[in-house]
Amino acid sequence: QTLNRLYTAFATLDADTMATCYAEEATFDDPAFSLKGRREISGMWHMLCAATLTKNRADWRLEFSEVRADDNSGNAHWEAFYRFSVSNRLVHNVVEADFIFTPDGLIASHTDRFDFWRWSRQALGYGGWVLGWAPYFQKQVRVQTRAALTNYLAKHP
């Protein structure tokens, strides 16, 4: 099943296998990223997995549960434990994921929901506590993650 393959690969930071779970024209949305196409989604997973493998592998752990899917859609609960590379702070992110599948079982749409303010307080400390609730701050995070992904994709075509 696609979702078990995705999260099993994520747990071991295997971005190559994760990328094979997505359709060519897939979309991905969460509070930090809004992506279109397998290239961008694959690039995000490769960028995040590479950063964790390089800098903070010992702090990484992923747990997933409540994986449900039929031929058309699915959902899962997952929790990531990691060290945020920008601040070197430990984060425990709790995520609910929703999926829509193509007829051949690949992910056409992937939406992750998590409490952005909770995440920002853990990842950024005081600054996240003060600003993490503000839509402007979340927009700025999206701008920064988009720039980081664009830079990564330029270096890893």
Regions found by a protein language model. Give the residues of each.
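A beta-strand edge to alpha-helix "cap/lid" segment located at domain peripheries
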Residues: 53-56, 63-157
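Short, low-complexity N-terminal intrinsically disordered segments enriched in polar/charged residues
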Residues: 1-20, 24, 146-157
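Hydrophobic pocket/interface hotspot
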Residues: 6, 18-19, 26, 37, ...
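Hydrophobic alpha-helical core bundles mediating ligand binding, dimerization, or RNAP-core interactions
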Residues: 3, 10, 22, 45, ...
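A general structural-boundary detector
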Residues: 5, 28-31, 85-86
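A solvent-exposed, acidic/Ser-Thr-rich amphipathic alpha-helical stretch
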Residues: 15-19, 23-74
